[in-house]
Amino acid sequence: VMLCLTYFMGLLIFYLLTSWLPLLIRETGASMSQASIITALFPLGGGIGVLILGALMDKINPNKVVAVGWLLTGVFVCLVGFSTSSLALMGVMVFIAGSIMNGAQSSMPALAAGFYPTQGRATGVAWMLGIGRFGGILGAFSGAFLMQAQLSFETIFTLLAIPAFLSAIALLIKYRVSKSVPATTDEARSLQKA
């Protein structure tokens, strides 16, 4: 459930921002070309974020790494909202938020694959991916409601940080709960053989 919630929230943020970020930036007084360039920075850093989080997941507990990724995503998404004084600063904040967010989101299938037992792994990951798509749909539509509500740029990005923070909390809950669940007999036997 926590993996599905996290993936849902991640796609909600991603599709809302990739669909509506140019219009939101235009509302701050930027030209359409400036808004398009800044928007392109959001997914651009994803490759960097994936490499960094992937390497960290191999060295540190993957749940904690991805949870921190979501926590930092929330912080930097919020900071985007308060960077309207400078388009260059906004571009940097969007790039960092996109790098971390895309890294955390792209790490989710690997995290899920490590969580589910072998016989149910494909089903578990598929459910997470499928439920996450509904977050993407909701994200694309949510932008219209936020624009219609005429909320400030700062307010919109502060609200957008909430799903990222919820994702971090969900992964920490998943980590705590899965740590307290005893291994099944088959898992215990395989650990004893190793």
Q: What would you call each of these model-derived segments?
A:
Residues A161-A188:
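Multi-pass alpha-helical transporter architecture, strongest
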Residues K64-L79:
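Structural signature of the two symmetry-related core transmembrane helices
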Residues V50-N61, M147:
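Helix-to-loop junctions at the C-terminal end of transmembrane segments
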Residues M147-I162:
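A membrane-interface helix-boundary motif in multi-pass transporters
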Residues G103-Y116:
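Intracellular juxtamembrane helix-capping segments at the cytosolic ends
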Residues V1-V50:
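Extracytoplasmic gate region of multi-pass secondary transporters
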Residues A113-A149:
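A late C-terminal transmembrane helix in Major Facilitator Superfamily
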Residues L89-G103:
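Hydrophobic core of transmembrane alpha-helices in multi-pass small-molecule transporters
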